[in-house]
């Protein structure tokens, strides 16, 4: 994808910095083709594209492709996240989530087909992901931007808004 240099506004910088640091820590050779999704991409869109949005959520969602196609990378992400101060818990829908400082982290994977399959165990990472339809739209059309010492991937705005239009009636 295209690379941009991200200069976030002072108001969003601290929160977005936490999210980007978490992404970098989790993405080190483990979450192949993972990207930040959900409302946390909006401050990035605002800085890069001038799209205005008032961030009101502390949910941090990462879309993941479940494994590198040539080798299963084993890593205890549950341990990694909890070592960063997050507490893991199982939501009412059975999805594993992590919480700290008002943030709630969740992993989302593409769900092919139309039926609900519950949570998706990802044994090689010691966690589970919530399978949702049409996540592949977000993962297939993404942008990478520089942030501080690292970079972060997120859906291209066109893909993000198309995804919202498709899932809104559901």
Where in this protein do the model-derived segments appear?
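Compositionally biased terminal segments of proteins
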Residues: 1-170
């Amino acid at each position: 994808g295209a690379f941009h240099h991200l200069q976030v506004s002072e108001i969003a910088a601290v929160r977005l910095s936490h999210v980007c640091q978490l992404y970098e820590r989790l993405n080190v050779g483990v979450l192949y083709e993972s990207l930040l999704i959900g409302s946390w991409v909006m401050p990035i869109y605002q800085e890069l594209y001038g799209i205005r949005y008032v961030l009101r959520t502390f949910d941090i969602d990462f879309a993941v492709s479940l494994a590198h196609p040539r080798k299963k990378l084993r890593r205890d992400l549950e341990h990694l996240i909890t070592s960063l101060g997050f507490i893991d818990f199982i939501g009412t829908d059975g999805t594993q989530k992590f919480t700290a400082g008002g943030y709630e982290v969740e992993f989302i994977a593409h769900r092919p087909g139309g039926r609900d399959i519950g949570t998706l165990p990802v044994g090689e990472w010691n966690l589970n992901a919530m399978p949702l339809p049409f996540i592949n739209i977000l993962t297939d059309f993404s942008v990478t931007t520089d942030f501080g010492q690292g970079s972060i991937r997120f859906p291209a705005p066109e893909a993000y808004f198309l995804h919202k239009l498709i899932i809104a009636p559901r």
